């Protein structure tokens, strides 16, 4: 039974996902269906959390839009995600950056990792 589940999960896992960590600025291109139309929508922000659970893996991206914080949780292996682009690598010491929710402006900046 367990090997059957592993086999099905292995078929559904995406192979073209870039390596990114918490603190990185990424752009996620997602398919959006509005009525009968289908288009790509881009969501760019800082990764504040990653959950690695094989096929159930997810990551949370936060951005500031019109002075309001917007967070979105994406399933890593979802068919709705077209591509993930790493724009900038951030230098952080924590895995979960939930403290960014209370910070605004210059206090919410993250240093860049150069390597």
Swiss-Prot record:
Q: Which PROSITE patterns match?
A: RIBOSOMAL_L19 (PS01015)
rRNA-binding listed as a keyword: no
- In terms of superkingdom, the source organism counts as Bacteria
- List this protein's GO terms for biological process: translation
What the entry lists under Pfam families is as follows:
Ribosomal_L19 (PF01245)
Q: Which residues cross the membrane?
A: none
Q: Which InterPro entries match?
A: Ribosomal_bL19, Ribosomal_bL19_CS, Ribosomal_bL19_sf, Translation_prot_SH3-like_sf
Q: Which GO terms describe its cellular component?
A: cytosolic large ribosomal subunit
Family, per entry: Belongs to the bacterial ribosomal protein bL19 family.
- Descriptive protein name: Large ribosomal subunit protein bL19
- The organism encoding this protein is Buchnera aphidicola subsp. Acyrthosiphon pisum (strain Tuc7)
Upper classification of the organism: Bacteria, Pseudomonadati, Pseudomonadota, Gammaproteobacteria, Enterobacterales
Gene encoding it? rplS
């Amino acid at each position: 039974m367990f090997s059957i589940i592993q086999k099905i999960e292995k078929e559904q896992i995406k192979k073209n996902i870039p390596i990114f960590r918490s603190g990185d600025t990424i752009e996620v291109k997602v398919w959006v269906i509005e009525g009968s139309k289908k288009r790509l929508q881009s969501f760019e922000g800082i990764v504040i959390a990653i959950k690695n659970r094989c096929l159930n893996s997810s990551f949370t991206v936060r951005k500031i839009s019109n002075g309001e914080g917007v967070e979105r949780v994406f399933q890593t292996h979802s068919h709705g995600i077209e591509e993930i682009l790493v724009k900038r690598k951030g230098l952080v010491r924590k895995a979960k950056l939930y403290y960014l929710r209370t910070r605004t402006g210059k206090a919410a900046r993250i240093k860049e990792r150069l390597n």
